[in-house]
A protein has these predicted regions:
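Mg2+-dependent prenyl diphosphate-binding active-site environment of isoprenoid biosynthetic enzymes
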Residues: 1-2, 6-169
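A mobile "lid/hinge" subdomain adjacent to the ATP/sugar-phosphate binding pocket shared
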Residues: 170-174
Length: 174
């Protein structure tokens, strides 16, 4: 649940975030509570397939967050690593939600695979668009510049770093 509030943003899609209302510690506890409540419901209802999807999603998001932290320290991220990170973080979460929806209505395995793949593509597109918002207008409901301040390596930043000279890179990194 901490990954959902990791950027400490006060707004989400134009609304106040849980973090803004309750601060980090309470936001993390509320997230942990909701996650454990959902997992217990899966156990009570013998929805082990759904429990497996949730567990795998949390694992993927954690791996993605750790990779992002590691790479941000060194600023040695390329497009391939960027896509690995967003697939493990945002895309795996959206993909998992789509998969759970399909599993919960007893879809065929081919339908589950298709909707899971669609969710992965939606998650990738969502994250790229979210990264672009960091550089956009104020009217979008997300504060600008947070990713840069937190040294998040985003696709626009990767493209910029690949297309500027060394002195410009040094200036940008400072």
């Amino acid at each position: 649940s901490e990954m959902c509030i990791r950027d400490r943003s006060n707004k989400r899609r134009g609304f106040f975030s849980i973090n803004a209302i309750w601060k980090n510690k309470i936001a993390v506890l509320v997230g942990d509570f909701l996650l454990s409540k959902g997992m217990l419901l899966c156990i009570d209802n013998k929805d082990y397939d759904i429990l497996d999807v949730i567990s795998e999603s949390v694992k993927q998001m954690s791996e993605g967050e750790l990779l992002q932290i590691e790479k941000a320290k060194k600023l040695d991220i390329d497009e391939e690593t960027y896509f690995e990170i967003i697939k493990k973080k945002t895309a795996s979460l959206i993909s998992s939600c789509c998969k759970i929806a399909a599993v919960s209505v007893n879809s065929s395995s081919s339908e589950v695979k298709r909707i899971t793949k669609i969710g992965m593509h939606i998650g990738i597109a969502f994250q790229i668009k979210d990264d672009l918002f960091d550089y956009g207008k104020k009217t979008i409901g997300k504060p600008r510049g947070i990713d840069i301040k937190q040294k998040k390596i985003t696709l626009p930043l990767i493209y910029t770093l690949n297309n500027i000279n060394k002195s410009e890179k040094r200036w940008l990194i400072k």
